[in-house]
Curated annotation (Swiss-Prot):
Residues 690-710 have a biased composition (Polar residues). It catalyses: RNA(n) + a ribonucleoside 5'-triphosphate = RNA(n+1) + diphosphate; ATP + H2O = ADP + phosphate + H(+). Its EC number is 2.7.7.48, 3.6.4.13. This is RNA replication protein. Residues 910-1065 form the (+)RNA virus helicase ATP-binding domain. Residues 1437-1544 form the RdRp catalytic domain. Belongs to the potexvirus/carlavirus RNA replication protein family. One of its GO terms (biological process) is viral RNA genome replication. One of its GO terms (molecular function) is mRNA methyltransferase activity. The keyword ATP-binding applies. 2-oxoglutarate binds at residue 656.
Amino acid sequence: MATIRGAIDRITDTTVRTTLQEEACRQIRTELKNVEHVNRYAIPPDAADALEHLGIGTNPFSVKLHTHGACKAIENQLLYVVGTLLPKERVTMLFLKKAKLNFMKRCPKFQDIFLNQHIEPRDVSRYCDFNVQSTSTSIPTHTAYISDTLHFMDRKDLVRLFINSPNLDTLYATIVLPVEAAYRQPSRYPDLYQINYDFDGFQYIPGGHGGGAYHHEFSHLEWLDVGHIHWRGPDNKDIQLTITAQMIESLGANHLFCFRRGNLRTPRVRTFGRDTQVLLPKIFRPVDKNFNRAIPLTLANKMLLYAKSINTVTFRDVVAKTRQLMKDKELETYTGADLLHMANYFFVVGALSGVNSYDQMLGLSAWEACTMALKNTVTNLWERITGKREFGKLLEALEWETLTYSRQVTQKYVGGTPARLPLPDITDQEEIFAQQEALDALTSGATKITTHHLMSAAARRSTEGPTMPTPAAQVPPTQNPKHTIDEVASRALVTKLQKNKRVYIQDDGPEYIMGHMAEVPAWYLEQDETTTRLRNRCAWFFGPPTHRYGHNDIEYHTTEYYPWVERIGNIFGKFNTCLAQTHDQGARIGYHADDEDCYDKDVTVATVNLTGNATFSLKTATGTRTWKLKPGDFIVLKPGAQGCTKHAISDCTTNRTSLTFRWQARPCPSQLRRVVNLGNVNNPKRKSKAQQWTPKTSNSDSPRLTQTPNSPTPKDVPVVSPKLADATAPTIRAVPENGAHTNMACVELTDLPETTTTHRPGKEPINDLTDSEPETESEQTENLVLNRFIQDLPTTSTHAWASETDSICSFQAEALGPSSVEALPWHEHLELINSLGFTGLERQYGPDNNLIWPITHYRTLPKSRTIEAPTDLVELLDTIDRHPTDVPYSKTRASAFGSDVKNLRIGALVKNQDKQWRASLALLCEENEHVLPTTVIHGAGGSGKSHLLQQWVSSTERGNVVVILPTIELLRDWLNKCPTTPKDSFKTFEKALVQNSAPVVIMDDYSKLPPGYIEAYVALKGQCKLLVLTGDPRQSHYHEENPEALISTLDPATDYFSKYCTYNINATHRNATTFANALGVYSERKLPVSVTCSSYQKSGWPTLVPSILKKTALNDMGQRSLTYAGCQGLTTPKVQIVLDNATPLCSEQVMYTALSRAVDQIHFFNTGPNHSDYWEKMNATPFLKTFIDHTREENLKEHQPAEPTVREHTPATHFPPANEALALEPWVEPLTDKHSRELHHKALGHSNCVQTDNPVVQLFPHQQAKDETLFWKTIDARIKITTPEENVRNFNMASDIGDILFLNYKEAMCLPADPIPFQQSLWDSCQAEVQQTYLSKPLAALANAAQRQDPDFDSNKIQLFLKSQWVKKVEKLGCLKIKPGQTIASFMQQTVMLYGTMARYMRRIRISLCPSHIMINCETNPTQISSWVRENWDFSGQSHENDFEAFDQSQDANMLQFELIKAKFHSIPEEIIAGYKHLKCHAHIFLGTIAIMRLSGEGPTFDANTECSIAYNHTRYFVPKGCAQLYAGDDSACAAPLSEKPSFQHISPELSLKSKAKIRSQTKGDYATFCGWLITPKGFIKNPTQLYASWLLAKHNKDLQDVARNYALDLRIAYQLKDELYELLSPEELDHHQLLVREMVKHKMGHLLNLPEGFKQT
């Protein structure tokens, strides 16, 4: 072992070490399963070490507790040993619970006999009455086993047992007796058990817990010494019987003995363990003053060496050393006297001289050598007289006696005549054995029914009516309207069951009896042609041949009673029918009563829960009772209970089986239709020992028989059982009754009930409460056609099945005729097509009018001969012609992948691996070439190519398989389809590379794996013995974005592995026929399809997008989206596909992948406007007078402010006076001279924005239209000159972002899912408003604009002006460098009014739909906003503001795209939308065409700015639902801090618009600002600093008479807060507020400060 360990330690390659660890882990996992069988308990570490010393393992992860789990593990281990020793035949078990057969691994078919007897009271709970004998009995078998009860017997009892059991040869017995008790020593294994010595006996205490303790007499220990037991006969002379005993195993205090008839040899000495203890000599007198206990030899030697190692030993030193060497657990086994005696012993030994004082033999002369013997004799005599020397005394004190637990066997003699033992009463057990034998004979001898015989019987049943009792016997019972319980019959039933030892009654209620069966026979029901498959269970009906039963137009197949079923029913009473049901996982049946007409009203119903668990609910007049049924439980509903109770079943476990017994008094309704199950068909060409896997076939494709999506789903649909519902089930061609042969579609008989009738749940025991629906006329017609066809089957199908070479498809095509089938190009593969779930009898054509083959690229490949993989998987693959073949794996492809991983060119997870691992991977890929058994499965999406593998993965053991998936979507799909498989069996491809592998590796959709990955994985993972690749070569393959990666130059993996695929499944179960044929794929799903295309999105539909950018953005919005290429694994009834500029860039494979996802509905979402002839319409723009139609403007109701509310009186306050000279000093002090702040132009000089010498006035830049320098600097900064073509090109490229902006805007503003219909009346009203607003201007203003009304004025021309203004924003107050100004664009007046109408129209709709938590400062006043703030704003945390940079010029083509999508969603006429786009792309000034941007003179400027701000905010940030938000143009504020969406990092480079977030703490002096106002808990107040500074500017300009009133009204809102201002404003803001109040008073505006809140400003 040291050599092996050293060799392993010398291995430094991490991959090899990982492989070794994986193999070790697999072995550990297997061993832990074995350990769990014997020891399932959580064992303390010390006890676990003791168990491992005894050869019993412990699971360190177990959490199951037991008071003496370690001793239980020893007991289970001995049971396992006994199980290996017992013969594979019937054995008698004495004093053993039947459940312990599991530990012995005894098969129930051995039919072991249990003879138990109540020796102690606790035995009553151990053994049920079913196998308890009243006295000792003889043993009828050759071998017997006694479990832990031998100590209750003596040697005479054993002899008596052998004498009365002539068949008994061998008796195994376990006994629990600690051998150390014979010496009154403490426990040898104190961590496992302890021993007390009291009351002239000893007590064995497992685990130190008294609950499991046993008291023993010392005489019981004699069993440990027994070697032979001799019986001398009645006369006590000659030995007539000898029993030889031998101990086979000893584990702690548990021992296994074998007693054999005959005089055989047995070891003379019986060893119970190694000798490790010694007894110290008694060196003191009297004798009781010595240490009389045994101590470990190791401890004795340590104490001796210590006592002799120090110079002068003291008694204290010895005591201290003893305490040091002894563990705490050992100290509790010694008394104080014992410790003192031991210390004295070693103190004396330590004091004696250890130097040998006797003569030496070295260097003696001849004389001395001759006289040495005489001298020694004299010395010995002298020491006997005078005493020994010190060294001699020491040697005598060290004569330790070894304490051994080995014992010599003894011979025991017994005489006299033993009493006779009766024969055991095992009638009940023999009855169970007979049931089992009958079942075995029934199942093993069952004859396979051929298809011809089965269908012939079905045809006869369809013509012959079932035989029923004569009408004379059908006497209707007397109706009992009160539905009372038959008390007399119920008492008789309870009495009968109480006397039956085979059942226990646990609950006796007024309407029911609930109990448990003493013994549940081992049995099973095999699904065959007698099985009726319902929606969530399989059913069998047992009864006399003359009886028939059914419900809801369904008739069950009547089967004669199985003997074991009848015997179970006889336990509970007299019954003539039984309904057996096996349920699926989670199956349930609603409340119902067994009150059909075929039963009497006082019928007794007994339900037995044989296997699995379920919940049984009983609803009575007094309430509802619920029981959790486990195997063996039963419930009997008393006579009359069906009239006053209802019962239900739920929470069934997988394969939960029940038997329901009833007495059927009269026939069922004659309208029942018998369900024909045409399964159980032998396939002559595909014979295998393994069960044939057959995929589930699709529903019928007949238009007449197919259940439509809107039709109700039947509750109970009788179909063929899972074993029978396979691809080999015959299929009937249903022909219309009129003989027409149009659209002859396949109808599977197994699916016929599902598509023709509606049923309700079956019985548990009987019916549901709903009434059955009458058969429709169409259903009757279908049944007539079916029955007529079935009657002809015996003559038409006999020849078809006579040949061994014919396959199932021969019968399927019989109705069409052999010529039609042989004419199919793929008729040779028709059997294979059938096994895949397709009929293959249709000719379908693709878009190019070429015939579509269901199977393509069929080839024959050599089969691999060396496959180290599970045989069941290999056989399953062989059944569908997918046998593995040897595939060589390219070293070139593997080395390219390894090099990229090593040099960090690809991957995410592998980049985090250490350098050594990456280098090792690259080395393995470069050096190793592999040939591996591989199966390549190609098939279209939805073809079921992975279905076989998923079934096998769900059933195989853990550790056998690893499934590698390329995408998370595909990983979820596998997890959903294999819910019982451990999740660690499914891995993404990078995780699979760094984690453990398995013997079988499945790579699904392998075309999406990186090129070279498969080869590298095979090179790295030596554990892989079989590789299965599934994929579709027509779908998208992996795309490597890094051009420097070597794998980017490799061909797709499908190009290499296609030649190792036996055939390609070019058929699908997913898509409707129309969709599939459009893709060139065969499909038999005849469904109506829907294809739509529009510029709006369907809500709730899965969305496929061409780019990762858009996918991430949509996911951040909470919409499920996938890329075209990344949607593999998605199957959905409907899907929407986004079309944008990236769509034409996608390959054919990518588009095929996207288009094959939906079943029958596809919606194309076009994100850009349709390219039609819009430009010519713009040339017909009329003159201003012509488009101003004098229509009467709709009178809009004037806004009436709400009645002013009386606010709580706020106490008046007084602000201390502030220093006016220092109020703006923080802004004035940093100012520099005028020219250092002004803008400079080389030709025009400096601008003139800094006015006067007053430092306060210099804080405000004055921008003037006549300032040429500022004008040209503004054009340079704000205007970008381009060409119309460039604008159009930029617009077309921006569609990828515009739709994202709109979808976020739509979600934020709660717009409806579908486009908003155009309202002409609303448009006319908005148009009138715009016209009236324009005509309300002064005449001079209209005259000045006459040029722009001229028809010769270019509609695309813009007159550009510089806006004159004082810049008063607080953030720009006292700026050290003057910034460019703002432009005013004057468009043609017709254009302004047209798009002003469009903006106003969308504003009206926006106002009506705007959510309450969003406020837009448009057509509102501060009072309204203040009230809204108090109701909606959250001041408990931080707030958020957006500060945009160059907001107008940043609204480029992306924002234009957003505006157009928004306009189309509002159903604005196309010509108006196209004109707006043309204007934005062709607008020009005197310098040329300007780039797409926002201009201040446009009609929709404010509304467009506001909506762009909303769209930007919600695209960039996660905005909490219901968060209060304020918007006005480029100003915005939110009542919560916003976190940026991860998708925005992909969108941000495409957007010109930039912003900086401002976070406010919303505390005193730091509240959010909006349009110069502060958002405070008391409402909206004007910023005191900005208000005061602008007042000083107005005061300097001497225009106070015009503005003083407005300043007073703005100040009034804050002034009326009075003392509350202290809670809101900073000290500086309070100073500015106080100074402004003083100014208002000085200018006689103080009276305005006290106006009420609802005052309307004029």
